[in-house]
Amino acid sequence: SCENYQDKKTLVSEAELKKISQLKTPNEVIGLFKIPLKNPLKKSGLTVVLDSINDPGNLGTIIRLCDWFGISQLVCSEDTVDCYNPKVVQASMGSLPRIAIHYTDLKTYLKQSKLPIFIADMDGENVYKKKLPQEAILIMGNEANGVSETIKELANQIISIPRFGEMQQTESLNVATATAILLSEFKRGNELFK
């Protein structure tokens, strides 16, 4: 909890800040925190699962989205980028310590779950025409290849975000952008049907 550390502030020079941050353009403030102990995976609520996400910016943004939408845990395949990568930490904009992140074998995890499994895919059903449950697993796939075939086989439903542009020349959405839209739809639907 941040409250315990409010009095522990240190002023550093711009040069020191650049050394600490490892980024070309560091923020003016850097937070330090202990890497939390692994908590057991929850088996309820809405859980986001990431299959082979490679881009640190995407993972950091998805962590921030989980925080925004009140999703307390994120499950990642073992080959997803490390959540403590400096670029992930920066992109999460302070949300990282509030989200429980688990790296695990997705096939084993999904086979043990009793929640409905939704996969985001370009060829899925229109998400805007579906009633979405409060408790589910939403799987988002790799930036270039989507969700792997071995994971797709475990899905109960495949959903997509329809395109509305007339020319439809854009190939796909960025995985973090798609995650934002789908999480909004899961949460919006749950508010409508309370």
Q: Which residue stretches match the model-derived regions?
A:
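Arg/Lys-rich RNA-binding interfaces used to dock onto structured RNA substrates
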Residues: 1-55, 187, 193-194
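Short beta->alpha connector loops at strand-helix junctions that form conserved
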Residues: 12-13, 51, 77-78, 100, ...
